[in-house]
Amino acid sequence: MKLNNASLPDVSIAKPSYDRSEIGVGIVHFGVGGFHRAHQAMYLDRLLSEGKAKEWGICGVGVLPGDRKMATVMDDQDGLYTLILMNPDGSRDARVIGSIVDYKFAPDDPEAVVELIAAPTTRIVELTITEGGYVTDDAGPDSVFGLVTTALARRKERGLPSPTIVSCDNIEGNGDVARKAFTSFAERSQPELVEWMTANTRFPNSMVDRITPVTTPDVIENLSADYGIDDEWPVAAEPFTAWVLDDDFSDGRPPYEDVGVLLVDDVTPYELMKLRLLNAGHQALCYFAYLAGYRLVADAAGDPLFAKFLLEYMDTEATPTLRPVPGIDLPKFKQTAIDRFANPSVRDTIVRLCFGSSDRIPQWLVPVIKENLRSGEPVRLSAATVASWARYAEGVDEQGEPIDVQDNLADSLVPLAKSQLDNPTAFVENTALFGDLAQQPRFVEAYLWALDSLHRDGARATLEALMNADDR
């Protein structure tokens, strides 16, 4: 049964109980992928199911060539898709999500996107454009920044309030990063708009959390076999979800607090906790795991040695850099994170975690290292993680098989990593990624030890040595 509005009454799993034709667009979301559909769109679907937020429906927008597939699927399925929660015991909870009521592929009609954002009914613009998506140097008028800035100028001319711009990407101070990016773009393209944006446009910081693997063919096949639903692009995710938002909006917001979103005055403590424990923990795991032969995150996290390494990193190096987090049991959060990684039903891949490392390590791990160098706290496990990335980036595993290093900077990183066989600090001398870490003796000593051990003894033996050492 093809999933769309016509077939929705016949769907046997949980589905929208609300009339989607009555839902107005109040949120424009750039970057509709698996995570947005498992997270922000899911929260809004919950509100709609409670008879709330009918003016806050989502219109997704794609700006990249690769977004055309999503545009086609959204059109074919009237914006409907299935969210499947993968429980650790092997059971699954499936629901059709209906909160995305429209989708526009910007390259086909950029003017329509601009007018949508400029419409008085649009009050929030959301972003999931990845950690590397906030560089505006080469951004043009048809980019996210160009489209939104043009729309803001029209709202200014029409005397309309500014929409709130909400970044939902895993970046420390994501709202601040978004503000800087949009302001920088406006200064070059429409300088007369900057003062109005500064006075009127809000960019709340946010913390988002849900492990959402890439949708694989077996997810699609199982959905059809188990429930009779033909969904071209369902989403599978873990049961855990969290969203913490600065309560700072320009023109209203949905009552997110009614469906479990935490609205706070300062999201920073929650954000640092998540990025430095969970996200950086993913990076601490993934390169060692790949080199040791693991290909699924759950298998690696279920290995007692790897779990011990993760908890040790969290306890001794990440935690000292955190601020007090109101209402959070930190030891429980850390153990829950490892348990989430080890969920065998969430078939998240090591390769996904390794993807785009040049955007991730500088955002999530390098700040931990720098803070601990300043404060005198340990850095050996963080330095070993950087060394494991450098070893992975050489492009050959421990069996001599090629590694497909998927990174925007792969063309420069792979040769740099290979050159460390002659110049051991070559990789970390990249100041754009690591700042001055190559000039920090305590970091360099720990890094060189780990890199030498990885080359000489391999990933598993290196972890064993790290876990058996009192200090290094």
Language model features: what each stretch is:
Residues M1-R472:
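Substrate/ligand-engaging "lid" and interaction regions
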